[in-house]
Amino acid sequence: VSEYEFPNNIESYDGYLLTGSPVSVHDDYDWIKMLSDFIGKANNKNKPIVGVCFGHQLIAKYFGGVVGNNEKGWMIGNFPLEIEINFPWMKKKVNTTDLYHFNKERVIKLPEGAISFASSEDYPYYAYTIGDNIVCLQGHPEQPKRAMYNFLEVTKAVLSEKDIEKANSCIGSGKSNSVVWAQWIMDFFGSHFPPKN
C-alpha cells in the first residue's frame, strides 16, 4: 500500500492483514490516509481484519484511539505478555506468552468499544479486538530472531548505544511464542470461513 496499490474492490478478498511499517501512523503520507479510509470500508463490509504493529496502531487511531510515544523509548526484543482473555476462536489457550516487537510508539488509549486481551508492563493495550471482525496486536509473530537482528542492524543509525545494547540483550533472551500468535491469527480468520462441505 505504500506504493499506492490497493484492491479495486473490498470484495476482492475475504479478509485483510495490515502489517508493520518503518513509518509512524502520524506521518503525513497520502497512502496512510487512503489506508485509513480502506479500513473503514472493509469494516463496513464486516471483513475480518488483523492489524500488526503499524496496522495495530493505525486501526486504533482510525476508530478514535490514541497512539503516542512509549515513555521508555524504543522497545526492541522479546518481552513477556499476560493474556487476559482467551476467545472461543483461539484453539490454544494460554495465560502468558512472549513475542518480539520493534517500535517506539504504542496505543495509549483504546477506541470506544475495543476490548484489550493482552498486556505487559509497558503495553497496557498490547492486543485488542473491535467487534467480532477486528483483531490487533503490537508484536511481530511473523518475524524470527534473525529478522529482529537484521532490523536492528539497519536501524542502528537512529538508535543510541544504550538502545542497541538493550535490544541485543532482549532479542536474545527467552523464546518468542510467535507460533502461538501466528496460529491465533489463522484461527481468527478461520472462524470467519468455516470449512465447506
Regions picked out by a protein language model, each given a short descriptive name:
Residues 13, 75-78, 94-96, 131:
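A structure-centric signal for secondary-structure junctions around beta-strands
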Residues 6, 67, 90:
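Short clusters of hydrophobic/aromatic residues that line enzyme substrate/ligand-binding pockets
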Residues 1-47, 162-197:
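N-terminal beta1-alpha1 cap of cysteine-dependent amidohydrolase-like domains
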Residues 19-87:
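Cysteine-nucleophile active-site neighborhood
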Residues 7, 27, 60, 110, ...:
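Active-site-proximal flexible loops/turns
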Residues 44, 83-197:
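Amide-donor transfer/coupling interface in amidating biosynthetic enzymes
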Residues 11-13, 30-34, 64-67, 114-115, ...:
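Short, glycine/charged-enriched secondary-structure capping and boundary segments
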Residues 2-3, 56, 74, 106, ...:
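Residue-level detector of flexible, active-site-proximal loop/helix-junction positions
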